[in-house]
């Protein structure tokens, strides 16, 4: 009974310490953001407005002269001009939305909205049997071992894929869930006593 009070106190102190630590981290981030914003505002404040205007006019003049020299090579942009109408959530699986309609996809995905996995329905790192060969989806491509893994494979079809599930990622997820559940139950038991 006496040790349960110590566990309860230790657990409470740990939670309070984490809350304080996270709060300080957010305050530091906010201070950094404010400092960066102030620094940027000071850098962008016009110290000599005549110099800035002259620089812009020089840039425009040089652009106009280049445009006239190579007018055949340039196509005017007639695309979307109002940023309010752009769909900023057009991509899936962590893709970057470009102009509200196109996506720059991460390594293992493709398609207009990053909806297609390059290995199909096979998750990165999983082993599968494709015909007579043992294959693994690595970085978006299905890599197969060069040797035949079974006898009498000539009778099987090449397109047949049998999944061999790897337990590595699932084991990590299960352990995390069990630790969270154990922590919750320990807290519940300690508070009821």
UniProtKB/Swiss-Prot annotation:
Record keyword Secreted present: yes
Family of this protein: Belongs to the EGF-CFC (Cripto-1/FRL1/Cryptic) family.
Lineage of the species this protein comes from: Eukaryota, Metazoa, Chordata, Craniata, Vertebrata
Domain of life: Eukaryota
Keywords: Cell membrane, Developmental protein, Disulfide bond, EGF-like domain, Gastrulation, Glycoprotein, GPI-anchor, Lipoprotein, Membrane, Secreted, Signal
GO molecular function: activin receptor binding; nodal binding
Protein name: Cryptic protein
Biological process, per Gene Ontology: anterior/posterior pattern specification; blood vessel development; determination of left/right symmetry; gastrulation; heart development; nodal signaling pathway
Glycosylation sites: 38, 60
Biological role stated in the UniProt entry: May play a role in mesoderm and/or neural patterning during gastrulation.
GO cellular component, one term: cell surface
Domain EGF-like, chain residue ranges per copy: 91-115
Classification via Pfam families: CFC
Compartments reported by the entry: Cell membrane; Secreted
Disulphide linkage map: 91-103, 105-114
Keyword Endoplasmic reticulum: no
Membrane topology of the entry: Lipid-anchor; GPI-anchor
Gene3D superfamilies: Laminin
Organism listed in the record: Gallus gallus
């Amino acid at each position: 009974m006496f040790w349960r009070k110590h566990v309860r106190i230790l657990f409470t102190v740990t939670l309070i310490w984490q809350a304080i630590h996270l709060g300080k981290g957010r305050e530091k981030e906010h201070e950094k953001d404010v400092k960066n914003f102030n620094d940027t505002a000071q850098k962008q404040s016009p110290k000599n407005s005549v110099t800035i205007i002259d620089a812009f006019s020089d840039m425009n003049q040089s652009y106009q002269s280049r445009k006239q020299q190579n007018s055949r090579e340039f196509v005017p942009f007639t695309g979307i001009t109002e940023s309010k109408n752009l769909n900023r959530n057009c991509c899936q699986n962590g893709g970057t939305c470009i102009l509200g309609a196109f996506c720059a996809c991460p390594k293992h995905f493709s398609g207009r909205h990053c909806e297609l996995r390059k290995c199909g329905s096979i998750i990165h790192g999983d082993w599968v049997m494709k015909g007579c060969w043992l294959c693994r989806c690595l970085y978006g491509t299905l890599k197969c071992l060069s040797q035949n893994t079974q006898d009498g494979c000539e009778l099987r079809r090449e397109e047949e894929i049998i999944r061999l599930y790897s337990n590595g990622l699932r084991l990590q997820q299960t352990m995390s869930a069990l630790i969270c559940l154990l922590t919750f139950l320990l807290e519940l038991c300690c508070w009821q006593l």
